[in-house]
Curated annotation (Swiss-Prot):
GO cellular component terms attached to this protein's record: cytoplasm; cytoplasmic side of mitochondrial outer membrane; mitochondrial outer membrane; peroxisomal membrane
Gene3D superfamilies in the record: Tetratricopeptide repeat domain
Organism, as annotated: Schizosaccharomyces pombe (strain 972 / ATCC 24843)
Protein's job: Has a role in mitochondrial fission. Has a role in outer membrane fission but not matrix separation.
Protein name in the entry: Mitochondrial fission 1 protein
Membrane-crossing segments per the record: 130-150
Keywords, alphabetical: Membrane, Mitochondrion, Mitochondrion outer membrane, Repeat, TPR repeat, Transmembrane, Transmembrane helix
Subcellular location: Mitochondrion outer membrane
Domain comment in the entry: The C-terminus is required for mitochondrial localization, while the N-terminus is necessary for mitochondrial fission.
GO biological process: mitochondrial fission; mitochondrial membrane fission; peroxisome fission
Membrane topology recorded in Swiss-Prot or TrEMBL: Single-pass membrane protein
Length: 160
């Protein structure tokens, strides 16, 4: 029997779209208006808005809010695991993203959004690995060229 998926999560590609200033301000105004008793949904909305910002500091603040919701609201834990993983993904903290994503998939292995994020995560790690290999190869070639140049100068000065 296949388990039915019930969580409603944003597609991982939503993290690529930067939130508009107007939308962010509207959510922030709602958050500020509810002070000091902010509803869980408003807190969640602000966290998601912050994560969709192009500011690393905002993404980190959104991540912190999602972690707070995770701790304080057991009924939203699975959902928060996804958004925490997505936040770490956006920050290029791939190991942390994988850790939270695996926690979610252990509880909800059929989550289509989590499975898409897992694929994106794999692609990002693979791409980063290739870039790392190119950088290392470039450094090796540079060092070899420098050693060759230094050796040539050293040996050409010794000849009578």
């Amino acid at each position: 029997m296949t388990e039915k998926h019930t969580l409603r999560l944003a597609d991982p590609s939503a993290i690529d779209s930067i939130i508009s200033v107007d939308e962010f301000l509207q959510i922030k105004e709602q958050y500020d208006a509810e002070q000091p008793l902010i509803t869980l949904q408003t807190k969640f909305n602000l966290a998601w808005a912050l994560v969709r910002s192009d500011s690393t500091q905002h993404v980190q603040q959104g991540l912190s809010l999602f972690c707070s919701i995770y701790k304080d609201s057991p009924e939203r834990r699975l959902e928060c695991l996804y958004y925490i993983a997505l936040s770490h993904y956006k920050l290029k903290q791939y190991e942390e993203s994988r850790r939270y994503l695996n926690m979610l998939l252990s509880k909800d292995p059929n989550s289509p959004e989590a499975l898409k994020l897992k694929n994106r995560l794999y692609d990002a790690v693979t791409k980063e690995g290739y870039i790392g290999m190119v950088v290392v190869a470039g450094a090796v070639v540079s060092v070899a060229a420098l050693v060759g140049w230094a050796s040539k100068r050293l040996f050409s000065k010794r000849r009578p």
